[in-house]
Amino acid sequence: AAVTGVPGKPNLFYFGATGGGVWKTNDGGRHWENISDGFFGGSVGAITVSKSDPNVLYAGGGEQTVRGNVSSGFGLWKSEDAGKSWAFAGLPKSRHIPRIIVDPNDHDIVYAAVLGDLYKPTTERGVYKSSDGGKQWKKVLFANENAGATDLVIDPNNPRVLYASTW
């Protein structure tokens, strides 16, 4: 599961569910609306809102918790209208995306931590970067085929510096 808020809007939250879908609340969690039916696979492990444009959301498929009955996802999805509509944004073989980071100054610069297939070695693991809002992706970090990226943090003083953990 994943959750994110919107700066300046204390009652607006988005929630990516382990059971599937992206949900939205405008009243601090009293009522939730599914805003993604028909767009995603079994689970959402990462969700983020752009600081430079809060209408831009990214959601990554696959649970971030590793256990025996984990469900995989099918890449990354993007909304440019606060969740009213969604478009596939790539990384179809990622299986598990535990973190998505958006450059605070440019919502087209996006980083995705990809854990990959939990049950076998794969070259899909690592950290990916898109400079065009998810149209094209480049792998910028690859530890090895057994260690996927599990978390990302962007330096708030210098968005060109990113910290990643692999496991």
Where are these regions (language model features)?
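Beta-propeller blade termini and top-face loops
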Residues: A1-W167
